[in-house]
């Protein structure tokens, strides 16, 4: 089935992961065969949220884009529902790459990875492990820096292990809201989510075709604690990176994103997005095109084999 909104066309598609899950996706085909980007939305988000504005922009510049619902989310397969597993999501980028490489509209030698917020660090890790990715674009990457003490972490681990034991005894997974009424996150990490995240979550409910649900399994947080984008950076090698950093990010402070950028030793570019915050990065305001244009320029520079 094909849809068109404001002259933006996409096709509903699906592909399989190595462990036989079906992931539902949108394919934004360019006007002719050529380069492509594998894209994924943010934490517990679906393909209808945030990323479509970027995909449509890339499409208009001749880049085919694939956005897919992460495993366990939206219309994609996987259980427990809304269990966020960064390690498996890295794997899914590789399977999305395999799918994209087989499409007639795509040049398999000109595919990059793209991610925003949570998925930016997932895409970065995937690019470290998949030599087929010719570049990686990370937009407002969440760096998994929890900003808590060892004692605070132990308290979280005690609660997570207790819930894991409850599941082992036959109880259903426990679900927790992404943010409470005060905008606090359930594991009390030192991150300023507050009003911005709470407002975004309310908006996301109206955007998702499959009904965005603002809860995740409590065990998702165990999986977050076991992941770090820094662990894979040594394998990125000469794959070019572009990082887009919002001027006013409080969800993942600018200095944390720049620290991650500085840890990359290979070819790289950074763009500081004027007027942008973490959760309005892809809103089509007056700052949108100035933020998207450098990404397109970087992408085609890489595809032409020019030095970064």
Swiss-Prot record:
UniProt-recorded Gene Ontology molecular function terms: transferase activity
EC assignment: 2.3.-.-
Pathway in which the depicted protein is active: Secondary metabolite biosynthesis; terpenoid biosynthesis
Entries under Gene3D superfamilies matching the protein: 1.10.10.800, alpha/beta hydrolase
First-tier enzyme category under EC: transferase
GO biological process, one term: terpenoid biosynthetic process
InterPro entries the UniProt entry points to: AB_hydrolase_1 (IPR000073), AB_hydrolase_fold (IPR029058), Polyketide_trans_af380 (IPR051411)
Keywords: Transferase
Annotated AB hydrolase-1 domain residues: 35-159
Consequences of knocking out this gene: Abolishes the production of all the sesquiterpene ester compounds.
Family to which the UniProt record says this protein belongs: Belongs to the polyketide transferase af380 family.
Biological function: Acyltransferase; part of the gene cluster that mediates the biosynthesis of various drimane-type sesquiterpene esters, compounds that exhibit diverse biological activities and are widely present in eukaryotes. The pathway begins with the synthesis of the backbone drimenol by the terpene cyclase drtB using farnesyl pyrophosphate (FPP) as substrate.
Note: The various drimane-type sesquiterpene esters produced by the A.calidoustus drt cluster include asperiene C, asperiene A, (6-Strobilactone-B) ester of (E,E)-6-carbonyl-7-hydroxy-2,4-octadienoic acid, ustusolate A, ustusolate C, ustusolide E, ustusoic acid A, (2'E,4'E)-6-(1'-carboxyhexa-2',4',-diene)-9-hydroxy-drim-7-ene-11,12-olide, RES-1149-2, as well as the 3 newly identified compounds calidoustene A, calidoustene B and calidoustene C.
Protein name according to UniProt: Acyltransferase drtE
